[in-house]
Amino acid sequence: MNGQQPSSQTSAQADRSIQPLALILLLALAAVLFFVGLGSLGLTDRDEGRNAEAGREMYETGNYISPTFNYEPRFAKPVFIYWLMSLSYHVFGVSEFAARFPSALFGVGLILLQYLFLTRCRGPVVGLFGAAMLLLNLEIIGLSRMALTDSVLIFFTTLSLYGFWLGLYGEGRERHYLWFFYIGMALATLTKGPIGFLIPMLAVGLHLWLTRSWGLFWRHGFPIPGLLLFLLLALPWYLIMLNIHGQRYTTSAQGDTIGRFFGTMEGHGGTLVFYLPVFLLGFFPWSGLLPFAWYQAYRSWRDSKRSGALPPSQTSVLDIHPSPHALEWFTAAWVLGGLVFFSLSSTRLPHYIGPLFPAAAILTASYWNRCVTDQATPGLRAAIHTITAVGCILALAFASLPPLYAKFAGKLIDEFPLAGQVTLGPGPYTVASIFLVGMGLIAYFGFSETRRPAVFWVAGGSLALVVLATTQLIFPLVHHFVIEPPQQLAEVAGVNLGPNDRLILYGQPRPSLVFYAKRKAIVVPKNEEANIKPYLTQPGRTMILLPAALRNRLPFETMDYPVLLERYGYILLANQSLIHVPEEAEQPPVRIPGH
């Protein structure tokens, strides 16, 4: 590859060859990063717990239409992710691994899709760069290892937009790729609601407007048949839910869509620039290249517009072939449109911008390919400086975690009863060291014309080592002392309670506990202790799971309830003794680090 974009059908055809060894190694790395230790960490709260339990209840009840959580209707997310989880439970059994398996599987599928698309459009070198950059960043790895909707959503929105590109600008049988534009949007809408079609439509609409290609799309994009296909796939489930639940479903759906855009939900707000640092950190280490890559795409489009290369309208089949830089324009519009949309939304969370990462990876891959073949690439040195600066900031942040944690541990009591008694171990310092060494090597190689290609491998390798250190050194401590204790007690409670008995979860709400109890639970937040009283006079066994520090806040009637089990700051009370205690629950607790 010489860094030039294909300018003819012949050159484009010559550059489409897939490199089997590179693809196998890429998918193997994705499988390692996404699947290894997938079930070793307990479900996190709150979304993972809710999603995994909704899928489990679907698996248990056989109700594949109306999702439930804690055996009450769950309207927050559409049904597709629960279908996938239920299928996974059928294959692997109910477990953390099975709950997260769909995310990991679609994560690998996303990397494969990225490689195949970009190799076809820009050749195997850029294809490898783009797929590896999409794989080796903090956000995609995180989302592909969690029981969330985002990994599946990103796959389908990406499939939709790649189908649009290949179908609109292809010839002959390639035109049929356009159907994936509508299929991908429909399945994305069944995965996470309206955002499933809004992201593709924003990217496509902005691209068609900037390139004056609306006429081309209207003639060759199958808009009417495509709309009918989209409605045929996406609409029936929503109509069935409306028929079952009526106004209740409509009100909830409006709250989870329009309500999230115009109002802050569950405290997830932030400023208009919230996503700039999120992009900088989540897409690291490639985020250092992104501003310069985006600007180069913008400048290319601006120069083409000024020179008259963009026609007033495209009026014939001969105009289907796009500009050599049109793919970069398209992905720049994809990133810009999505970033503006999510920034204007009142509810903001880091994983919302995940659907923009495939486009960001294409931009940075094309820009990096130019950097290693053209020493005069604008912004190159500034990009290297940006990568190393962000990496050093991350190193400082990880190195500062232990002292900051020690200082503010007292404020974490509600979420972490043993805060202040457990240390973070060597993990943060190990991660900080990896960042510092990696950034030093990037600076060393990046400012040398002959050694510059090594930056890609050093940056990717550093990120992989950071993930490895985090999963092996930090996550086990977090799991053992923060996540697992109440989940283990919930599992014991579930084994010992009959259909007419009660489990009360008191304190900070933890939806994952319902998953481990595998039964309906009564959730009573802190300061609402009076709601516990009516259940204490009912016949049968009553169990209460709570942080030990809140024991004295319970109603007086529970004062004679003995503590049946205690685990790292959590206790399980009951008005009757246990019937069965799992063997692992009888094991004595291990020594607390730092004591």
Q: Model-found features: residue ranges?
A:
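Membrane-embedded architecture of ER/inner-membrane glycosylation machinery
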Residues: N2-A12, P20, R175, W179, ...
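Membrane-integral, polyisoprenol-dependent glycosyltransferases
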Residues: N2-G379, F398-L401, Y568
